[in-house]
Curated annotation (Swiss-Prot):
Residues 160-194 are annotated as: Disordered. It comes from Bifidobacterium longum subsp. infantis (strain ATCC 15697 / DSM 20088 / JCM 1222 / NCTC 11817 / S12). Keywords: Chaperone, Cytoplasm, Nickel. Belongs to the UreE family. HAMAP family: UreE. InterPro entries: UreE, UreE_C_dom. The keyword Cytoplasm applies. One of its GO terms (biological process) is protein-containing complex assembly. Pfam families: UreE_C. It comes from the Bacteria. GO terms for cellular component: cytoplasm. The keyword Ribonucleoprotein does not apply. This is Urease accessory protein UreE. It is found in: Cytoplasm.
């Protein structure tokens, strides 16, 4: 697939491993593609890897830190989830844990539960709310790994850094966009535009370009 500027857009539509948990001995260069924590479960997005390669990402699953999204002959592209400000909330009993998780669940917050603490992405209202209900939260910097990602509705969830929108607002906007694009296809899905025709398994376009991989990449001899 070609970008508007004419450069090649690579497609990432599956996760083929993880550079943190798996061992690779093929000598390929690991190249990161950076994601914010709230992008980890988006259905479709455009990203740029550290080497400048553009990607259309639609893996159909929540992306974890280190997930391998694409490979070439000499490179392995993996997800790097940026660290974020988190609220660490210590708990001292199962009763406290149950009460806290109930309160956070009502706010549709993504969270990570450990033996003696609960972690949620930072926003000021959540910080103040946990103080109000009797806990002693503090702000830390950490990776957003192993979290339970909660699907929030509009107006609920965590406020996304740098915006006045919540994770629920962003999810609803994505759904609304899909509703207004009835003929849209997932990135990497095989389909033919009206201006394309197929001969012996090769797609051709009126501008002379052709594709051997069902329209994912185009070139001209």
């Amino acid at each position: 697939m070609q970008t508007k500027g004419g450069s090649r857009l690579m497609i990432a539509n599956r996760i083929s491993g993880n550079i943190i948990s798996d061992t690779f001995s093929d000598g390929k260069l690991n190249v990161p593609i950076e994601f914010e924590w709230f992008e980890a479960d988006k259905k479709r997005m455009r990203k740029v890897a550290a080497d400048g390669t553009e990607f259309g990402v639609a893996v159909g699953a929540t992306i974890a830190d280190g997930d391998v999204l694409a490979e070439t002959a000499d490179k392995r592209y993996f997800a790097r989830i940026r660290t974020a400000q988190l609220i660490e909330i210590p708990v001292h009993s199962m009763k406290e844990m149950g009460r806290l998780c109930f309160e956070l669940g009502n706010r549709h917050l993504s969270l990570k539960v450990e033996d003696d603490r609960v972690l949620v992405p930072y926003d000021h209202p959540t910080m103040e709310y946990t103080k109000k209900i009797g806990f002693d939260p503090r702000v830390i910097e950490g990776g957003f790994d192993g979290f339970l990602i909660v699907k929030a509705h509009a107006g609920a969830g965590t406020i996304v850094p740098g915006t006045n929108k919540t994770t629920g607002d962003l999810a609803e906007e994505e759904q609304e966009t899909e509703r207004h694009e009835p003929h849209a296809h997932a990135i990497g899905e095989h389909h033919h535009e009206k201006s394309e025709y197929e001969v012996n398994g090769v797609l051709h376009r009126a501008d002379g370009m052709h594709s051997h991989d069902h329209g994912q990449t185009w070139h001209m001899h």
